[in-house]
Amino acid sequence: MGDSTASASTPLGPPVRRPRYTIVQISDPHVPADGFLFGRVDAYERVEVSVEMMAAAGCSPDVLVLSGDLADRAEAEAYIRLRPVIEAALVRFGAKLLVAPGNHDDVALLRVHLLGRAPERGPLDEVARVGGLRIIGIDSSVPDEVHGELDDAQLKALADELAEPAPDGTVLVVHHPPIWSTTPMSELVALREPRRLAAVIRGTDVRLVLSGHTHRVSAGTLAGVPVWVSPSTGSHADVLVPDGFRAHAGGGFSRIDILDDGEIVATFVPLTGRDEILYDVRLDDAELRPVV
């Protein structure tokens, strides 16, 4: 757990505040079964680099959130590749893990080859707790589709869980962002009917919603609750493309800190990458579906 003393003395003036809880969010690495993403990006290595950057900065997260699209093509080998680096990070930091699958994931294969569980179908909805903080992951993936949905049973289960507040509040994780996007492409593949989720979390102890999917950093609100959309570790989407989806090498991960007084700060941590275009497709392009 983060430094609950909340501050440390400095020679420059007021004490520096320390977080009570730290969450690191890695999203959309799109790890292939072998080789490189788009033939150029070592997506697996970028997850490794993210972990090493945390360690080098002295960041020891309480929770590691993987917010979907862990595999690029839903292959078992991708999860097998990822598992050692994720398990090593959990041991290294003493962190808990929460996974919210994305549209590129196969939930049954993810359960078996990343989490070491039985190959069950159906949504992967989970709850993790650290101290008085509750982190809920809800699975918005729809088999063979790009957009996200939450069914009635999931929303009912979420409402039941939220009926009893957690001492330090709740962070909700869902792969598909429940907020508007600046590009039509991202809007088309976002979470459908976000107002239904808004109705469930309104007035509850949910203090932050974490998402991924769009490969860009953005923020908004849902039912008055802040929403943070994390970047991809594998690529960075161009927010100024009016009619398609263009990605550059780059990306990063997110660090979310919760302080003793309840303040929450989300920070984008960039990974270095060459400024090259990885793909550039339009809404009517036959190559569109494989990349979103």
Summary of predicted features, one role per range:
Residues 76-160, 164, 196-202, 223, ...:
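Extended active-site neighborhood of metal-dependent phosphoesterases/phosphodiesterases
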Residues 32-35, 72-75, 81, 103-111, ...:
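Active-site environment of divalent metal-dependent phosphoester hydrolases
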Residues 1-81, 181:
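N-terminal active-site segment of His-dependent metallophosphoesterases
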Residues 15-24, 127-137, 163-171, 222-227, ...:
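Beta-strand-turn-beta hairpins that frame and shape the catalytic cleft
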Residues 3-8, 226, 231-292:
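Metal-dependent phosphoesterase/phosphodiesterase active-site architecture
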Residues 27-48, 72-74, 106-121, 144-152, ...:
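Acidic/histidine-rich helix-loop elements
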Residues 50-63, 147-228, 254-255, 262-264, ...:
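His/acidic metal-ligating clusters that form di-metal
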